[in-house]
A protein has these predicted regions:
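Alpha-helical transmembrane segments and their membrane-interface exit regions
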Residues: 50-55, 76-84, 135-143, 162-164, ...
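Loop-to-transmembrane alpha-helix initiation sites
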Residues: 69-74, 170-183
Length: 205
């Protein structure tokens, strides 16, 4: 995929779906506030699930033009979304927060996505906004890391997309350096969870 085609897809997607994006972003903010207040902490996971499924079906299956979007990216986001919804339903009592200084810092960086895209010379609709693949995965990584319970399969899937932030240097989308940072952090979370499993196994033996 060329950089020009990449930005053309973004432009069409933003122009035609902005109202749905606004609704999803409002739900994410609401879910985050609920979680901070220790109320209905499952709602944020469900909303992240819906947002990832929206990206998989709408951004990649409907607006996508390349095989890699249809056969890799779309299934990946659909799987991430399904796991988030399953987590929200099955572990509805899972506790959120408090976030660490590092998590707050990463969250602050993710909220800067549109501003960074604008400062790099992009304007709406040809710019990166929140309800897009890379910002959504970045939000998903940071917010999911705030929960006590972690699904390592979900973390691995999030890491897979997070590390694609390296493409920021090839598609002139330098704002996706934020995604790369979140991907590296998520990889660290995976290693941490594996370490917990090993320690638990040693204690049991």
């Amino acid at each position: 995929m060329t950089a020009d085609l990449f930005w053309n897809i973004i432009e069409d997607y933003n122009r035609q779906t902005w109202i749905y994006q606004a609704a999803l972003m409002g739900a994410l903010v609401f879910g985050f506030i609920l979680s901070l207040k220790k109320r209905a902490q499952w709602f944020l996971k469900i909303t992240l699930g819906v947002a990832n499924i929206f990206i998989g079906t709408v951004f990649f299956l409907y607006y996508g033009t390349e095989p890699i979007q249809h056969y890799f990216a779309a299934p990946l986001f659909l799987a991430i979304g399904a796991l988030f919804i399953l987590e929200g339903i099955r572990y509805s009592d899972d506790e959120f927060g408090p976030l660490s200084p590092l998590q707050w810092s990463l969250l602050a960086l993710v909220t800067l996505y549109p501003l960074v895209s604008f400062l790099l010379g992009n304007t709406f609709p040809r710019m990166v906004v929140y309800i897009m693949p890379c910002p959504i995965v970045s939000f998903s990584i940071v917010l999911y890391s705030g929960y006590k319970r972690k699904n390592i399969v979900l973390l691995v899937l999030l890491t897979l997309w997070g590390l694609t932030g390296i493409k920021s240097f090839f598609f002139n989308a330098l704002e996706d350096i934020i995604l790369l940072m979140c991907g590296i952090y998520c990889a660290r979370c995976v290693v941490s969870e594996i370490g917990k499993w090993k320690r638990a196994g040693i204690k049991e033996s």
